[in-house]
């Protein structure tokens, strides 16, 4: 099969792409992309893995499925493309970021700068139909993204897993807590942010954990883009 990922992830995951479930998922996606409006663009599906090589992962922020509005999703959990209005959950993430470590709120919603520093921004489902949340749930993506979580968990080097909300916290059973750190709270969505997300200080706590491991902390402050 054609190599879909850069070497570091391909070496970990290539066997998955030959399995029957992935072949079925691939056929479904071919039909969906040819007959429906699907997000993100097919070239962006694996951006979480393209921006953050396997050996560079320091932290994981798990999301659910991609944003389903025009121009939003680009393959990174919680992130939107520059020039697109920040969705409510992302606005709340930036409020907590400001309260936690004093970063000013950026003039865009792209989290690429985090991904390039080793933050794996992984959704558990990697595609969605326009305007239909969870439309590709249960189609096979979860098996692949569970395997991604597993190969990260298998690494010797400790990692910080940031789990916001029940959906992400269901993955706790896949994480070896004798080796890795879990930081969790409610989801940053407007429905739950005030019930434990605000004030949870995930960014400073992640950096404190990384420094304790002897790792470079993450510069969470996101630079503004030129207007």
From Swiss-Prot:
Name of the protein in question: Uracil-DNA glycosylase
Cross-referenced Gene3D superfamilies: Uracil-DNA glycosylase-like domain
Keyword annotations: Cytoplasm, DNA damage, DNA repair, Hydrolase
Main localisation: cytoplasm
PROSITE patterns: U_DNA_GLYCOSYLASE
A molecular-function term among this protein's GO annotations: uracil DNA N-glycosylase activity
One Pfam family matching this protein: UDG
Compartment list: Cytoplasm
Leader peptide range in chain numbering: none
Function: Excises uracil residues from the DNA which can arise as a result of misincorporation of dUMP residues by DNA polymerase or due to deamination of cytosine.
Organism superkingdom: Bacteria
Catalytically driven reaction(s): Hydrolyzes single-stranded DNA or mismatched double-stranded DNA and polynucleotides, releasing free uracil
Top enzyme category: hydrolase
NCBIfam families in the cross-refs: PRK05254.1-1, PRK05254.1-2, PRK05254.1-4, PRK05254.1-5, ung
Family: Belongs to the uracil-DNA glycosylase (UDG) superfamily. UNG family.
GO BP term (any one): base-excision repair, AP site formation via deaminated base removal
Coiled coil spans: none
Active site: 65
The protein's Enzyme Commission number: 3.2.2.27
Protein's organism: Bacillus velezensis (strain DSM 23117 / BGSC 10A6 / LMG 26770 / FZB42)
């Amino acid at each position: 099969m054609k190599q879909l990922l850069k070497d570091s992830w391909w070496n970990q995951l290539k066997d998955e792409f030959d399995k029957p479930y992935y072949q079925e998922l691939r056929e479904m996606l071919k039909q969906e992309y040819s007959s429906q409006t699907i997000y993100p663009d097919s070239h962006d599906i694996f951006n979480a893995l393209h921006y953050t090589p396997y050996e560079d992962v320091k932290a994981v922020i798990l999301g659910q499925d991609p944003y389903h509005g025009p121009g939003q999703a680009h393959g990174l959990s919680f992130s939107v493309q520059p020039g697109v209005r920040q969705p409510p959950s992302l606005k709340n993430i930036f409020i907590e970021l400001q309260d936690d470590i004093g970063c000013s709120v950026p003039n865009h919603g792209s989290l690429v700068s985090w991904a390039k520093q080793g933050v794996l921004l992984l959704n558990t489902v990697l595609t969605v139909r326009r305007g239909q949340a969870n439309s590709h749930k249960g189609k096979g993506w979860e098996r692949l993204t569970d395997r991604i979580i597993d190969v990260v968990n298998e690494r010797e080097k400790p990692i910080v897993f940031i789990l916001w909300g029940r959906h992400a916290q269901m993955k706790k059973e896949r994480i070896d807590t004798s080796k890795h750190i879990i930081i969790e709270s409610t989801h940053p969505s407007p429905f739950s942010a005030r019930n434990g997300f605000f004030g949870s200080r995930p960014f400073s706590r992640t950096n404190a954990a990384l420094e304790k491991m002897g790792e470079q902390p993450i510069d969470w402050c996101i630079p503004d883009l030129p207007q």
